[in-house]
Regions:
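Hydrophobic core
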Residues: 12-20
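Glycine-centered hinge/linker elements that transmit conformational signals in sensory
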Residues: 180-182, 223-254
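Hinge/lid segment of periplasmic solute-binding proteins
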Residues: 100-153, 177, 185, 204-207, ...
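Extracytoplasmic/periplasmic substrate-binding proteins
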Residues: 41, 104, 239-294
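Conserved N-terminal structural module of periplasmic/extracytoplasmic solute-binding proteins
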Residues: 9, 23-106, 110-111, 123-126, ...
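Short helix-initiation/N-cap motifs at beta->coil->alpha
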Residues: 73-82, 103, 173-177, 253-267
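Short helices/loops that flank or line small-molecule/ion binding pockets
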Residues: 80-92, 161-162, 181-185, 260-274
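Short, solvent-exposed loop/beta-turn-alpha elements that line the ligand-binding surface or hinge
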Residues: 116-129, 196, 213-236, 286-292
Length: 294
């Protein structure tokens, strides 16, 4: 598998909504039971991420007996819809939530719907966070969130199919095109599965190509609304997506399958390359019967 370029929007974290709960005095926290509604995306019980998250919540509740945490877990696309609906109104049922930065987070901070954490994040806490990992959550001089995990978008490759096609695993875009065209000639094989029915994966393909064309700083500026998505590099990234489709590298109908279908085909040896997060390595490793595990 080859590492794919990291995209700015992949940095996610947890932020606190500025409700009266967080304006309460220390005496209230000490005397009364406080319920916090925590929204997240850790829904796979077999995932190490989910298990670590739930263990952290359990430990926190043991250490803070007056705080009860109500968990609200949804898959990515359902989460986006539901959390947007909440914030379109009062978001009274959201206290702590999983979100994307900097662009989408800035929409909420501009609307004054997120609590700045400057007074809560101590130097000790900062010392335990990887340097630079909070930069996307720092807007207008305020820190609004903390990173909950980190990952990269990666290009996972079935080496056996590459050998059958007589091509090497690509390290550049041009090599990706060359390999994809050769792989497309194999019977019943999709060269590159994106799972584009799930919108975030379709976006990840474009985002990765945009990073290649314009660089991380330009992407971040566009996400923050400081520049427009109209320069030639962003246009070229869109043209790259079209090229991949026109050459049959994305399969006949890349919008037909989501991540689950793409994953099944990849594990069954019907897909040569899959674009997914670095967590996908665990999916491969945990699969009982996989054509690519070894």
């Amino acid at each position: 598998m080859n590492n794919w370029k990291k995209f700015t929007a992949a940095c996610m974290g947890v932020a606190m909504v500025g409700t009266t709960v967080f304006g309460a005095s220390a005496t209230v926290f000490a005397a009364d039971t406080v319920t916090l509604d925590v929204w997240h995306q850790f829904t796979d019980p077999e995932s190490a991420q989910t298990q670590a998250f739930e263990a952290a919540v359990e430990e926190y509740e043991k250490e803070h007996e007056n705080i009860k945490i109500e968990l609200h877990g949804l898959d990515t696309e359902s989460y986006k819809t539901k959390i947007s609906t909440e914030f379109a109104s009062s978001a009274s049922g959201v206290d702590v939530f999983y979100y994307w930065a900097p662009g989408k987070l800035k929409q909420l901070t501009d609307a004054d719907k997120v609590l700045p954490l400057n007074d809560y994040v101590t130097d000790d806490i900062k010392s335990r966070i990887k340097e630079g990992s909070t930069s996307n959550f720092e807007l207008d001089g305020n820190l609004y969130a903390l990173p909950i995990d980190s990952y990269m978008m990666c290009l996972f490759c079935n080496k056996d199919l590459f050998d059958q096609a007589g091509v090497e695993i690509p390290t550049t875009y041009d090599e990706l095109i060359t390999a994809g065209e050769a792989l497309a000639k194999l019977d019943g094989v999709t060269p590159l599965a994106v799972g584009a029915k799930d919108a975030w994966l379709a976006g990840a393909l474009y985002e990765s190509l945009a990073l290649r064309e314009v660089g991380a700083s330009e992407v971040q500026s566009a996400l923050l609304g400081e520049t427009e998505f109209t320069n030639e590099g962003f246009k070229k990234a869109a043209e790259d997506v079209v090229e991949l489709y026109d050459k049959g590298i994305l399969g006949k109908n890349p919008l037909e399958d989501g991540e689950a279908e793409a994953t099944a085909d990849f594990l069954n040896g019907k897909v040569a390359m899959q674009l997914d997060g670095s967590w996908f390595a665990g999916t491969i490793d945990n699969a009982e019967d996989s054509a690519v595990k070894d």
